[in-house]
Amino acid sequence: MKRVVLLIVVAGVLLLCVVAVLRKGAPRPVTAQPPVMPAPPAAVTNAPAVSNAPPISYVPPLAATPVEKLPKGWEDFRKLREIGQLNRVTAAMENRTLPADLLAFFEKEIFNRQHWDVTRNNMANALVWQESPNPRLHELFAKMLADETESPVWRDYCLQFLSECMKSSSDPEAIKSLLARYAQGKDGLAGTAIVNIGLQEGAGRIKPDETFSQQLEAQLTDPEVVIPTKLSILGMIGKRHDVRLLPLVRSYATHTNDSLRRTAMATLGLIGTRDDLPLLQPGLTNRNRAVQMAAKGAMARIEAR
């Protein structure tokens, strides 16, 4: 009986040991961790801006560049090279009834100094040669003529076109005044103005008084007047048959400048007398062929009268 009880006790002790071993190797339960709370946000304050920070200014959006509206059939004009633009304008120049939009374009584009002078010249021709030109076209040429930043060549062109406008102008008196004013100068423009006064006189649109002849005399004796203008004056004296100035013309028939000399000889051929033949004779053997021809032609005209 004692042996049985002892075995039961031993068995119980062994069972407890096994249970203890099993519990020691078993996984431990995961204990719940407290949640991690985010840090509270920093308080927002109305702190002033840093003093050296650049101010933020409003920049409006860029306005769209307006698209230039060119005349019908001329949409590619800006893309052409200058020679192409010249050819396009020259072709239009021959049309005496150009559409209004193209004429308006020429009246603005003629101020564009990026064009060759010949291109601008042909635009002017197109405007002036119309069957019914703008009666105020002279104002356009007067404006460019007065602009001293324009080239001398282009201002000379403008003076000629200004004169050309007289026959269709709404204000021919304004053109007469401008021609008269520029004719009194000492530069090349004066010569151009004088020639055009003569042309308009021949057309019956201008009738210069005696003071014009006196002006020509004063300019021809003025050493500061440029040679091209004196050439124009000598030619004008012959064209107007201004025999009052014949003695002055004779003085130029022996001038050392060949251009002045031959022009004076040509004028003597128009208004000179047989008394001028001895004056012209030396010109026949002059070294300059042009002077020889002028002397020969003048003598032939005088002898034919």
Where are the model-predicted features located?
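Positively charged n-region of N-terminal signal peptides that target proteins for export
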Residues: 1-4
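Hydrophobic membrane-insertion alpha-helices, especially the h-region
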Residues: 7-20
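Positively charged, low-complexity intrinsically disordered regions
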Residues: 24, 29, 34, 53, ...
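Juxtamembrane proline-rich low-complexity "stalk" or linker regions positioned immediately after a signal peptide
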Residues: 25-68
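Structural detector for internal amphipathic alpha-helices that build alpha-solenoid repeat scaffolds
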Residues: 58-63, 78-97, 117-133, 153-169, ...
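Short inter-helical turns and helix N-cap capping residues of alpha-solenoid HEAT/ARM repeat scaffolds
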Residues: 81, 114-116, 149-151, 185-187, ...
